[in-house]
Amino acid sequence: MSASAVNVTPGRNVVVVGTQWGDEGKGKIVDWLTDHAQGVVRFQGGHNAGHTLIIGGKKTILRLIPSGIMREGVACYIGNGVVLSPEALFKEIGELEEAGVNVRDRLFISEATTLILPYHIAIDQAREARKGAGKIGTTGRGIGPAYEDKVGRRALRVQDLFDAKTFADRLRENLDFHNFVLTQYLGGAAVDFQATLDTMLGYADRLKPMVADVSRRLYDANNAGQNLLFEGAQGTLLDIDHGTYPFVTSSNCVAGAASAGAGVGPQKLNYILGITKAYCTRVGSGPFPSELYDADNPQRQDQVGVTLANVGKEFGSVTGRPRRTGWLDAAALRRSIQINGVSGLCMTKLDVLDGLDEVKLCVGYKIDGKDADILPRGAADVARCEPVYETFAGWKESTVGIKTWEALPANAQAYLTRVQEVAGVPVDMVSTGPDRDETILLRHPFKV
């Protein structure tokens, strides 16, 4: 190694994670931060969560490809912690290329990434149908079953596509197992071996130029002075271990997953940015202590919650499902900060609160008559939480597009200051609109 290489200062690495139940606005913030990064990394999840970007008034939804793809010259990485649907990937690539975005020269996919196959989707959908009213509310895209295969050491990975015979042998073995479950337990139809084999092997030549040793590339890039941005999907309260289990996703969504899911040592992660909306939302089933509105629940029709849903356009970017809405839960936020080791917060959608007469903040709970200041573990205990609120005067002035703290209404400043006090970490960024430029910066994650 040359002396000059030894003397290069390593780049900074920032991890962006959601602190709620997903849909916090991570995509916009990742896109904004990419101005200071040379690489963006997806490290978990699949195409079950969409990151929405508004750039120059144009809306783009990315499900698999890192948000950095919208910035020319930025390398994008899909790590080993992701579960990959080749069909969804090439659909997304096609949409981006039609819009004039160069993808294939800048996208690197770990050879160890788990594949989503047709039988994963069939099982996911059949399982939800069988559960009926007790369903978790998955997107039906095969994410969970693919992770189950990974943990069960049955998974087929990207690198397996390049050995057709071995792939066929392992596929047949997997189908023996999964078709039994589909037909004998879930009451579904069997998945055809030959059709699945032909479809999957048909992706091999198209994928191969993008397949790489992502862990090594990230190590070398960072040591050469490049800044890297790790882009989480979903949110901490959906984490398979730390979320409101069993109403969770099938992967680890916390900051620590960036290390395992991309093959990067934990000491390389310099700053953890926790994204929180100025209120809370949740999609699908599961407890939600500060809930105000649920389109499917006649008992949850509070008018403020309806306003939050309508003004905030709270509909899933992938599924289109209406999101449940509620006040910001700072006790749940404390749990997320603890688990992730959050360095600073970014509050998004502050502008959605504009015009409300009052704004409430959940600062703790009553659980069976006892005080609690942090979200408990597990859905059953969370369901017993009765929120304890602090109430703030609202603000009538518009915060849309504001770019400095001083320009915010005094009551909005008071609300943000209290969130910061209760959370115990600074609010370093505030988003005041969907466009990348509608952002207040108080401390820069790459420069702390």
Swiss-Prot record:
Keywords: Cytoplasm, GTP-binding, Ligase, Magnesium, Metal-binding, Nucleotide-binding, Purine biosynthesis. Binds 1 Mg(2+) ion per subunit. IMP binds at residues 23-26, 48-51, 139, 153, 234, 249, 321. It comes from Burkholderia lata (strain ATCC 17760 / DSM 23089 / LMG 22485 / NCIMB 9086 / R18194 / 383). The keyword Transmembrane does not apply. Substrate binds at residues 317-323. Its cofactor is Mg(2+). GO terms for biological process: 'de novo' AMP biosynthetic process; IMP metabolic process. Its EC number is 6.3.4.4. InterPro entries: Adenylosuccin_syn_GTP-bd (IPR018220), Adenylosuccin_syn_Lys_AS (IPR033128), Adenylosuccinate_synth_dom1 (IPR042109), Adenylosuccinate_synth_dom2 (IPR042110), Adenylosuccinate_synth_dom3 (IPR042111), Adenylosuccinate_synthetase (IPR001114), P-loop_NTPase (IPR027417). Plays an important role in the de novo pathway of purine nucleotide biosynthesis. Catalyzes the first committed step in the biosynthesis of AMP from IMP. GTP binds at residues 22-28, 50-52, 323, 349-351, 431-433. It is an enzyme of class 6 (ligase). This is Adenylosuccinate synthetase 1. Mg(2+) binds at residues 23, 50. Its main location: cytoplasm. It comes from the Bacteria.
